[in-house]
């Protein structure tokens, strides 16, 4: 007690405080509970007010009642008798965010607010007008529809202690200009992933907001581009920039000592990483997947790195020795899809913590490093596929008890599959892929010891013997894939016990005996593929119980009997191939009652290839669908030893159908059987059917009109049957039909004259009693056959012959007359327009045209000043183009633009073309489209991309162009790693001149002139000689004619290329094209894009060059050009002056493209330019052209000697 008195005497103020506390405790005990109750009551009222403001939904927040305390409300947690946490994730609130800021943010003791996926909308700005509890430090608003600029984040300044903010998966835009003030709070966690943030250098904004204390920062899944400045976030431990459009070198860090997680995957980062990460000592996760990094793998922090993903780059050399330093810590290592070579070092075996190693799709070679790999005691996933390893597969892998996935596919492994691969009963092997190797011998019975096995693929080997019945004990097996081996014997009945089985693929073996009816017990089966064997017996009707069955392939066997009507109960069936068997009886109508369902697992995690047959006599059936995972496409030649077909086309991948109509079948091949009777009319309900082959049977009767309902059919083969009657007119509605074969039947009457029948060859109708085009047999006008009618027929034929003869004679006179007129007209035109003659280049540079292609009869929209149109524009069917692009698959996509997507395709004649699939248009512009196509198709010049053909069906419009090897100038110049070539100055100069020449041709040689309207670097394509070809000329005019939904601004250019006068009036002119060309020329000189916020901020390339014109102008040139050859600086300046003349704000002061060519010739005369970009005298002879800018020998522009005046 004395001690306490001493303390009190020393601190009298403390004594007073203690006395006050004692008063509160002993004399006012009810006060504190009352305060808590009052506070809780206030919280309850605010929460109930929030509920009352929500849309009236009975099930929403049902237990938020005034009769219960808020601590028992759904999603509410309390601490110290106050609401401290609210989590309404996945609650369909359907309100504006302002309600949240009005009722929830002000809760005074709230620490955490989670409204993830709560259907919130509106902007963040309402937060600035509300109050915020001082304890609130975490807000999660992910997966809503909140919009507005991300600069609205500053509205949370009222929440002074806010540390974590999650705004991922919303619709936020780049920061607005009006709210770039610094925030009054310091975030540690900021998640902006999956928003609409694009085209903005975000890091300076983050710094300006004062978020320098960030520890977690995610921008994943946006559209950010440009360069990245040096990052200065000393506390940053997690940085995710994946799935953006960054195209720059590896980012540098001022201080990365705390960085633990770095994800740059799925961008376009390029170059050598160097030593950028050497000081990141705590880095444990590094993902550089799917970029364009090159060179050697750099030295990485070895003390802490656990997860390293380098997949999909261009790293080269042998296995990186520096990775040996990581062995103590690395858990997952992915080096796949690179260019590593050599042998795998023994040091990999020292990585005792390694759980995943993927070195697939490289060029590793040598003997399979068995001893090294067998040391990886913790390994779970081992993927070594698509390399060049040799040797055998050892038993020692059975010691890897944690191994779940072993993928050795597509190597050169030999020997037998070891019997002891799963000898330890504790094994955990789930996936075994050994396909596309050179294994021989039997499938070991001991594989049944792999009790956890889910997927087994041994296809594309040389395995012999029978399928072990012991495999029936693998109760978890989903995939049994053994195709293209030499397996014999019967399909084991024991497979009926594989209750999880989804895919049974045994094609191209020597299997015999019947199809086990007991397979119907495997109710999850999606795919049964038994084709190209020696199976016999009947198709089990019990297969109709497989409601998930999507693909049934039994072709090229010796199966007999009827087609079971029960197969119609397979309501998910999309592919039925029974060709080349001994099936008899009729086609059962119940076969066509599919519901339109499809098994999801069919299209999950699988790779498919469809091989279209060539149609030769030895080749039966329409084609073959194969599971192609883990197999090199070039290995398809091995199929030819078992299959007598030459493949006309190979399709990879498959698009999941979306069924809105009745039926789901897309492929039906019953050809080469002994079927009889008529075609069931129910077949016409198969709306999605793409391939129908009933050829080489004994079917009879008339072709039903209902087949006109097959709106998606592309191949129709009814040949070699006994069909009679006429060809139904309903078949003319099959607009996607690309191939038809009605030959060798008893059909009669006229072949329909309309499309698509006017595009098929005559042999497709041969050996019938048909008449009309394309057969050489004309049709008579009526059925009468009496003598009088016969005589009239002779007279009509004689008259017709006379008319034809007179017509031919008259045509010859007309042709001679037209030639004389053309010659005289041409002479006068040469005298009047001598300056323009050189641009004629009057020869077509399209070598892929075919003389058999048909003329169209559309009226021309323009009078084109050309000597001749040597070959008619090609008209192609939609089916042709659908086939050539594999159904417009993403693998064929090479570019996208304002008018549509562009696909690379190979047509049936072998020509490689580019197909532009235009945006959908209304039918109102059909006539205009045809007219414009005929016009554009006649424009031929060596610096223009020629239009080869077109197709129109429904709302689809497709244009076929000559394919340009190197793509667009934009890609080559600004995305060099994608194309793989570097443009030096001579190449750029050649491109500049070629593009100018092509544009000049459009402006001065087409009457009336063609205004491009969208001249830009992405519309300058480069052929195999890097010759510039201007593309998309006439597109804006075409789209305008077709009444599309594009805005006027879209039709008048692309931002960065649009001349200033277009913003006052959308009246386009050739001088507008000249301005746009000037921007392209600046791109060639500077190497920069016309709009890049990282380089120019709110400015653009033209404005940026203007600023430099007041200082050291040479700073604008691409440094790489001057590094290569400093002597070209004068020439660059001369070309810059040309660009400046084109970019004059006063459109009447700009030169014409003819004058631009004259300037280039003037520069050429004084610089000794190489022959690749030589300008001929005719290119610049413009007598009669209105006056304009003159250019002196030294390149000075006499309209204004100071460069800045032209800017």
Curated annotation (Swiss-Prot):
Keywords: ATP-binding, Cell membrane, Glycoprotein, Kinase, Leucine-rich repeat, Lipid-binding, Membrane, Nucleotide-binding, Plant defense, Receptor, Repeat, Serine/threonine-protein kinase, Signal, Steroid-binding, Transferase, Transmembrane, Transmembrane helix. Gene3D superfamilies: 3.30.1490.310, Phosphorylase Kinase, domain 1, Ribonuclease Inhibitor, Transferase(Phosphotransferase) domain 1. The active site is at 1014 (proton acceptor). Pfam families: Island, LRR_1, LRR_8, LRRNT_2, Pkinase. It is found in: Cell membrane. Residues 888-1163 form the Protein kinase domain. One of its GO terms (cellular component) is plasma membrane. Glycans are attached at residues 119, 166, 196, 235, 245, 287, 339, 363, 412, 449, 521, 556, 584, 646, 662, 724, 746, 767. ATP binds at residues 894-902, 916. LRR repeats lie at residues 109-131, 135-157, 161-181, 186-207, 213-234, 235-257, 258-280, 282-304, 305-325, 329-350, 353-374, 378-400, 402-423, 428-450, 452-474, 476-499, 500-523, 524-547, 548-570, 572-594, 664-686, 688-711, 712-735, 736-758. GO terms for biological process: defense response to fungus; hormone-mediated signaling pathway. The chain crosses the membrane at residues 803-823. InterPro entries: BRI1_island_dom, Kinase-like_dom_sf, Leu-rich_rpt, Leu-rich_rpt_typical-subtyp, LRR_dom_sf, LRR_N_plant-typ, Prot_kinase_dom, Protein_kinase_ATP_BS. A motif (Cys pair 2) lies at residues 771-779. Residues 1-34 form the signal peptide. It is a single-pass type I membrane protein. A motif (Cys pair 1) lies at residues 71-78. It catalyses: L-seryl-[protein] + ATP = O-phospho-L-seryl-[protein] + ADP + H(+); L-threonyl-[protein] + ATP = O-phospho-L-threonyl-[protein] + ADP + H(+). Its EC number is 2.7.11.1. Belongs to the protein kinase superfamily. Ser/Thr protein kinase family. BRI1 is almost identical to SR160, a systemin receptor identified in Lycopersicon peruvianum. Competition experiments indicate that brassinosteroid and systemin are probably perceived by different regions of the receptor. A 68 amino acid island between the 20th and the 21st LRR is essential for the binding of brassinosteroids. Receptor with a serine/threonine-protein kinase activity. Regulates, in response to brassinosteroid binding, a signaling cascade involved in plant development, including expression of light- and stress-regulated genes, promotion of cell elongation, normal leaf and chloroplast senescence, and flowering. May be involved in a feedback regulation of brassinosteroid biosynthesis. May be also involved in the perception of systemin, a peptide hormone responsible for the systemic activation of defense genes in leaves of wounded plants. This is Brassinosteroid LRR receptor kinase. The lineage of its organism: Eukaryota, Viridiplantae, Streptophyta, Embryophyta, Tracheophyta. The gene is CURL3.
